Regions:
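Charged, low-complexity cytosolic intrinsically disordered regulatory segments
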Residues: 2-3, 45-114, 125
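Small/aliphatic-rich secondary-structure junction motif
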Residues: 3-52
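Short, structured coil segments at secondary-structure junctions
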Residues: 32, 132, 139-141
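Short glycine/serine/threonine/alanine-rich loop segments
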Residues: 34-35, 111, 142
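Glycine-rich, Arg-bearing micro-motifs that act as flexible, cationic patches
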Residues: 113-135
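Short hydrophobic/aromatic patches at helix-to-coil boundaries
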Residues: 143-147
Length: 147
């Protein structure tokens, strides 16, 4: 008996590892005839840089579009793609972490399967999504693939 998977959520940042994780999400979506949603997670440091004028908002948007484009290139025609963005941390909400953002988005979108990368492009676990993976694995009510 096949699992009932209609929407796969893949959490991504601008790293190659996130795109690799999205490729797994594509394979799952294709296998189960599901749709794919990319959730772009922004690091608080990036948002502070944008707010301070040190980082161009257009550059951040270009990076997100590039990731979406790389995923779209690999996407079969049978898989519908949607995407959204969220900030991984909030100075106003102490409980808002990258992991909680992924879980909240999964609940809001009614995602049936989650895919999160464990390590960022720098290879350190200090990056946003690397930290999120453990939280998502521990608290998700959906199946999770962490790659």
């Amino acid at each position: 008996m096949d699992a009932d998977i209609e929407l796969v959520l893949a959490a991504v940042d601008s790293s190659d590892e996130a795109v690799d994780a999205a490729e797994y999400a594509i394979a799952i979506a294709e296998r189960y005839d599901a749709d794919l949603h990319l959730l772009h997670i922004l690091d608080q440091r990036v948002m502070r840089g944008v707010e301070a004028g040190d980082v161009s908002a257009e550059t951040v948007a270009d990076q997100q579009r590039a990731v979406t484009g790389r995923v779209r290139e690999r996407l079969p025609e049978t898989v519908a793609l949607s995407h959204s963005g969220a900030v991984g941390f909030s100075p106003n909400r102490l409980g808002q972490t990258p992991g909680s953002v992924v879980l909240d988005a999964a609940e809001e979108l009614e995602a049936d399967f989650l895919v999160v990368p464990r390590v960022s492009a720098s290879g350190t676990r200090d990056e946003v999504l690397g930290k999120a993976a453990l939280h998502v694995l521990e608290y998700a009510s959906q199946p999770v693939l962490s790659v």
